[in-house]
Amino acid sequence: MNTSSNLVRGFIGAALVLLTLQRSSLADSATWSSNPTSGDWNTAANWVPNVVPNGTSDTATFGSSSLTDVTNTLIIDLDSLVFEPGAPHYAITTLDNIRLYGNGVVNNSEVTQSFVAGAFFFKNNASAGNMTTYSSVGGFFSFENSASAGSAAFDLSSDSTPAYMFFSDSSTAADATINASAGFDVTFLDSSTGGTATINLSSAALVDVPGSFNAEHITINCIGGNQSLGSAVYLEGFSNAGEGTFTAVGGSTIGEHGGYIQVDNQATADHATFIIGGGLGAGLNSGILVFLQTATAANASITANGGVDGSLGGLVVFADKSKGGKASITLNGNSELDISDRNTGVTIGSLAGQGTIYLGSNTLTIGSNNQSTIFSGVIEENGGVNKSGTGTLTLSGANTYTGTTTVSGGVLNVANKSGSATGSAEVKVNTGTVGGSGIIAGATTIGTGSGTGAFLAPAIGTNKQAALTIQSALTFNSDATYTCTFKAKKNKAKADQVIANGVTINGAAVNLVGQTQGSLKRGLRLTLISNTSANPINGTFNNLPDGGIVTINGNNFQASYKGGDGNDLTLTVVP
């Protein structure tokens, strides 16, 4: 015999009997009296007819009345709580539960109606209403089934006891505004949705999402915290950030944590916007966005902003096996992207801004969303960079990473003025293009020898000639093309140029794209490759033999692989 089970059943049975006896005298729809004896909800004389509405099909109606401060101290079940047209402002305080099963709170008045809540339960299709406010310290709110928070405004905080707002089943936050502070916890369960709600978190308040929640167009702002914990959002389980906007604001006082957003388990950032703030003053903490386990940034737009007066910049972290997907990431000011704790490399859609990237020993692949962006910050540590997709990635900073740079699609535009845009290691252009007027430190190989085509084009994407500097050796394989543009008029000419410390050409091609005006002066010379090595160029382009002549716009140019100071590739105007 299960004694514990029988005791529980006995307790529930006794409670139901007591509740039935209570409701036998407190049940029916009624209207709050225009001249009540007190503000006590639970006094029958205050209602017309003289019964307290307390049943799942009952409606409590509030119209014109001489007393509009109302207090409830019992569990109340209602279909609806209705404010009639012309009703004045009511302030209804419930010290126990009000449970709504039908239409919920319906405000037909033209003024805002206020509730001070112990606990509210919205069930079935019940709504929290429009032009309604709910304030609570240590209270409890539950939206179940297909219930809605309507366009209500909630001002919620926690005292010494836990305080929660739950959305479960397929309920929705709708168009509500929820201000939560002091550790209040807003939780979205099951397949609940965010609608177009706005949630403002402060003083260590939380939004917790462990289920299959869809954020839709929600806005959540994490506004700092305290010295032990910042306000936080946890997107977990199979949750979906939808097209929501999530902001983690940096700390505003010494010791205060910034807002924290965590995308975890199998959650997706989908097409959401994330804004991660830096500290708001000298020495202050930043906001943080972290992707963990197998969560994905998907197609999100992520912007991390710099700190004020030297404070920490916003931080974006990919760890475990989390994925960057096609997310666009912008690092402003001294903000940071850290992938050093990833188990392997990570792919992101695009990269822009001026911040710092920590690779660890991983490879950061950039370009899966095919956008064209400029990054002028610093990429550090032992990992590498892979440019993918069809867009252009411009690197204009002096990067210090020590891993390989690979181009597997699109354009890598090197635009730095000092240091090396591609770190210290080798550069491999397997497919796609490398170009620009910047500096590459490592040995550079164009093509694989069996690929679909790889290009070196200093002037790529511009209308003027450029000189690309490679401080190590340059190799062109058989599937490579050197695209060289030039402009010439009479006795003046300007050509693209690659400057390299040693050159090997293994059957590659050169594509000469020239603009000339009239006949050029005999002896006019263009330098296509400036070889800074003491050794001669090894090999020739398959369509430009040594001594060969090419005709461009009626002008003849003769190639020499021993031109310039004796080991450069030059074109000289000849008859």
Please tell me what each predicted stretch does:
Residues N2-A60, G251, N332-N334, S340-N343, ...:
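Extracellular/surface-exposed low-complexity segments
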